[in-house]
Amino acid sequence: LTTIIPILLAVAFLTLLERKVLGYMQLRKGPNIVGPYGLLQPIADAVKLFIKEPLQPLTSSLALFIIAPTLALTLALMMWIPLPMPHPLINMNLSILFMLALSSLAVYAILWSGWASNSKYALIGALRAVAQTISYEVTLAIIILSILLMNGSFTLSTLITTQEYTWLIMPSWPLAMMWFISTIAETNRAPFDLTEGESELVSGFNVEYAGGPFALFFLAEYANIIMMNALTIILFLGAYNNSTFPEMYTANFMLKALLFTTFFLWIRASYPRFRYDQLMHLLWKNFLPLTLVMCMWHVTL
């Protein structure tokens, strides 16, 4: 509970931040009616979504239809367990592997939701999402492997000591760039949000969801965004952990995560969506060879 509630609160205010950032980038105010400066908007949205009647298509598979959003949110929250801030919830030896396994499992939630809706749009959206997530996980795994070679251990907590004197982004900035772009693709954000191409697929895999279940998907997506940014910070921009003031580490860490999250929103406001083939070309023809070469280079170091 100590992590779940703050994460959900962070997600709520991230939605507000996103609407504000996009608003100001389009020369308008964003939500500013509910509460001072629109601060109560996310709470109003949540209440509205959860008191709506959850619709369920007649032809859909009920069990999977309900399980998919709950699984998505559960996995999104479980990913936070091994993150050191500065101490993880559960200190695992193979925390990186745990996170990779969970992020691969998240594909199932998307696949089930699209398949159980029994709608063509949802199915196409889900298939796209699955292909995209699985593809980009390949580069993420290789980049993580390269970082672990410098770290010398599978535990995330040791990255803090590794980066005491210099950030890992310095020796491996091409990896950091590819990692950042891959995290955007992994979390299905613009310009990689092919799963919900409004012009062609209405809303993608969650097209048949309304009310509560839709809110769960929404929460899962944004929790994943914050989590991926937190992981980026841990891997490449390790905050300095001063043992006398551990609070400073958390503040430093969260400030960087906030900056990266704002960067995500900035990218969303700036760039148009990719075509599906461009997305796959970028990964299999550009990122994969590059990451493999970098990984080999790190092995030789």
Curated annotation (Swiss-Prot):
Gene it is expressed from: MT-ND1
GO MF annotations in UniProt: NADH dehydrogenase (ubiquinone) activity
Task: Enumerate the catalysed reactions.
Answer: a ubiquinone + NADH + 5 H(+)(in) = a ubiquinol + NAD(+) + 4 H(+)(out)
- Single Gene Ontology BP annotation: aerobic respiration
Cellular compartment(s): Mitochondrion inner membrane
Say which enzyme class the record assigns: translocase
* CC terms in the record's Gene Ontology section: mitochondrial inner membrane
EC no. given is 7.1.1.2
Protein family according to the UniProt entry: Belongs to the complex I subunit 1 family.
Q: Which residues form a coiled coil?
A: none
What is this protein called in UniProt?
NADH-ubiquinone oxidoreductase chain 1
The regions listed as transmembrane in this protein's record are: 4-24, 62-82, 96-116, 140-160, 165-185, 216-236, 247-267, 279-299
What Pfam families has UniProt attached to this entry? NADHdh
What is the recorded membrane topology of this protein? Multi-pass membrane protein
**UniProt KW Electron transport keyword:** yes
Q: Write out the entry's keywords from A to Z.
A: Electron transport, Membrane, Mitochondrion, Mitochondrion inner membrane, NAD, Respiratory chain, Translocase, Transmembrane, Transmembrane helix, Transport, Ubiquinone
